[in-house]
């Protein structure tokens, strides 16, 4: 009789635990811990926890390691943040991660790109800063595609020399330290609030808080209206859970902490972007000059 009671109790606790178990959704970081991707992944993970998820941040550091992780049966569904520039860079290095209806969950945001100089520079516009120069060094994250400044050098007669850094945080440090003349980076809260730099132009089609659009300064540059679109890529999410995950990620985007983050950096939240995959491929097409066939 005692064994029967113990068995019933064990079954009861097993059922109860199953019913009340937290849903799992990890946030994977296919890069290092010094850039925006890591900070944003922690922001997303915390918001998921607020929604009742069991969520951990898993750092895989690069595309190859990330593919290996995705192939494992970890028993923990997840997502990772991936932007248009990173996709193109991964493809150029032969690290193909399929983007399709199954893997592309939804857009996190569309973010402006910006050009910044040190605050101690006397110039208050990019044209003023470039005036009289024959060469300018431009810091950027190493994940950007090759040749992005070729058109600028050709059209302005000024040699734009690219200097790569490992992550946007180190790019900013490089500018402040005087390692480069200017930087081209994502327009985020970090750049906006930093008193040691001034960001003077953006990829928006309209001025942003007094900053001129690139299209006004560099009217023929192929990236003058191109920002960065970042989306949630599914990792081992069961098909029957996908719709719930997508809906919950929309809640994450509109949560106070995440919405505030996006608003302060003048980003467009994914919940306001229509035809999201089409928007993704449109930017990829611009970045690659319509040469990228692989999807």
Language-model features: locations:
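C-terminal lobe and pocket-closing loops
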Residues: 110, 189-254
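N-terminal (or domain-start) structured segment
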Residues: 21-102, 144-145, 156-184, 189-193, ...
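Flexible hinge/capping segments at coil-to-helix
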Residues: 117-135
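Bacterial N-terminal signal peptides that target proteins for export
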Residues: 1-8
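An extracytoplasmic/periplasmic, membrane-proximal ligand-sensing/linker region
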Residues: 23-25, 50, 154-158, 240-295
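Cleavable N-terminal signal peptides
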Residues: 8-9, 19
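A structural signal for short loop-to-beta-strand junctions that line the ligand-binding cleft
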Residues: 77-79, 95-114, 137, 219-222
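Secondary-structure junction motif
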Residues: 139-150
């Amino acid at each position: 009789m005692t064994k029967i009671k113990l068995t019933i109790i064990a079954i009861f606790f097993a059922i109860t635990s199953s019913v009340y178990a937290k849903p799992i959704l990890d946030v994977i970081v296919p890069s290092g811990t010094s850039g925006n991707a890591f900070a944003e992944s922690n922001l997303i993970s915390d918001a998921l926890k607020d929604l009742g998820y069991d969520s951990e941040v898993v750092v895989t550091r690069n595309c190859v390691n990330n593919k290996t992780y995705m192939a494992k049966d970890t028993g923990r569904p997840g997502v990772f943040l991936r932007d248009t520039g990173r996709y193109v860079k991964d493809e150029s290095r032969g690290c193909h991660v399929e983007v399709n209806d199954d893997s592309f969950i939804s857009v996190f945001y569309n973010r402006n790109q910006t050009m910044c100089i040190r605050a101690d520079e006397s110039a208050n516009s990019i044209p003023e800063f470039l005036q009289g120069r024959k060469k300018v060094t431009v810091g950027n994250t190493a994940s950007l595609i090759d040749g992005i400044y070729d058109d600028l050098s050709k059209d302005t007669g000024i040699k734009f020399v690219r200097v790569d850094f490992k992550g946007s945080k180190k790019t900013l440090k490089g500018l402040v330290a005087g390692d480069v003349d200017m930087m081209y980076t994502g327009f985020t809260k970090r750049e906006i609030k930093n008193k040691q730099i001034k960001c003077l132009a953006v990829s928006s089609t309209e001025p942003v808080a007094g900053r001129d659009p690139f299209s006004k300064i560099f009217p023929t540059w192929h990236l003058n209206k191109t920002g960065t679109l970042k989306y949630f890529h599914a990792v081992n999410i069961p098909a029957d859970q996908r719709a719930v995950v997508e809906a919950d990620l929309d809640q994450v985007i509109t949560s106070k902490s995440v919405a505030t983050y996006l608003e302060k950096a003048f980003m467009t939240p994914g919940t306001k972007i229509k035809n999201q995959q089409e928007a993704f491929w449109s930017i990829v097409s611009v970045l690659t000059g319509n040469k990228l066939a692989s999807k």
